[in-house]
Amino acid sequence: MPELPEVETIRRTLAPVLIGALVIGALRGEHPEDILLDPWPVFARRVRRHRIVALERRGKYLAARFEDGDRLVIHLGMTGELRLSHPATAPGKHCHLALVLRSLRPLPPSLVDQRQRFLLRYLDIRRFGRIALLDQAGWETFTARLGPEPLDPTLDPRALWSRLRERRTAIKAALLDQALLAGIGNIYADEALFQARLHPARRCQTLSLDEVERLLVALRTVLSAAIENAGTTIRDYRDGQGRAGSFQSRLQVYGKPAGTPCPRCGTGLARIRIAGRSSVFCPRCQPLH
């Protein structure tokens, strides 16, 4: 599933093309009803005649903001992909819908036709992604349910520690809760816990302030490095230009088979399940007690 670094990379690579473009229509694909919160006819009518003035991200959500304050909010699920395409290109498999846009500035002929039209296609093999049109009030209500982001410089470690002390869950499960911190998934939770030397099954209320400060530093370091490397491509993820990320070559523990030597101490890595997700860690570097 694309996490904060992947969605931020998509935002950065799509923004130069999308900002300023006018949505002039929508094309129905294979199964738009599995992706859209609105029925197709309602969505196709509502999305037309909107100009994109900003491309925003909140946690794992991408939002195209229109000039009237409405937003097209996209969650990519497990295998969602946004792909810029020339109108004459075939959609291919697993394309569920496309926006038809007109650019007000010149774009490469490989992307636009003679009328400066191009497509933004949504592809999704597993169809777990979601797309919704929200007005300003709906967007504010929706984002109010999300926690702060680890990269927010105003996030206070003491405030995070206070919130964690109220929880009796494992720290790994807490990190996956978007109401606590927005944008973290399985990849970067495992990587940050390894860097912070914290066992994924440690109970939140047992963490000291120093440990929470260390965890927040690790989260910021890992997420920033992942963004610098255009995200992590395990299988499906591509950025807004169709390119794979490269952070997968820098992963320390995520996805490693049990018994793989720890990159820090050489101890065999262990794998357990927490909150229904696989967690990989070093039993020596990340002791439970």
Curated annotation (Swiss-Prot):
Record-given protein name: Formamidopyrimidine-DNA glycosylase
Cofactor: binding comment: Binds 1 zinc ion per subunit.
Active-site residues per Swiss-Prot or TrEMBL entry: P2, E3, K60, R277
Keywords of this entry: DNA damage, DNA repair, DNA-binding, Glycosidase, Hydrolase, Lyase, Metal-binding, Multifunctional enzyme, Zinc, Zinc-finger
Protein family according to the UniProt entry: Belongs to the FPG family.
EC number of this enzyme: 3.2.2.23, 4.2.99.18
Cofactor dependence: Zn(2+)
PANTHER family: FORMAMIDOPYRIMIDINE-DNA GLYCOSYLASE
Lineage, uppermost ranks: Bacteria, Pseudomonadati, Thermomicrobiota, Thermomicrobia, Thermomicrobiales
Reactions this protein catalyses: Hydrolysis of DNA containing ring-opened 7-methylguanine residues, releasing 2,6-diamino-4-hydroxy-5-(N-methyl)formamidopyrimidine; 2'-deoxyribonucleotide-(2'-deoxyribose 5'-phosphate)-2'-deoxyribonucleotide-DNA = a 3'-end 2'-deoxyribonucleotide-(2,3-dehydro-2,3-deoxyribose 5'-phosphate)-DNA + a 5'-end 5'-phospho-2'-deoxyribonucleoside-DNA + H(+)
Subunit relationships: Monomer.
PROSITE patterns associated with the record: FPG_CAT, ZF_FPG_1, ZF_FPG_2
InterPro entries assigned: DNA_glyclase/AP_lyase_DNA-bd, DNA_glyclase_Znf_dom_DNA_BS, Formamido-pyr_DNA_Glyclase, FPG_cat, MutM-like_N-ter, Ribosomal_uS13-like_H2TH, Znf_DNA_glyclase/AP_lyase, Znf_FPG/IleRS
Species this protein is from: Thermomicrobium roseum (strain ATCC 27502 / DSM 5159 / P-2)
Listed SMART domains: Fapy_DNA_glyco (SM00898), H2TH (SM01232)
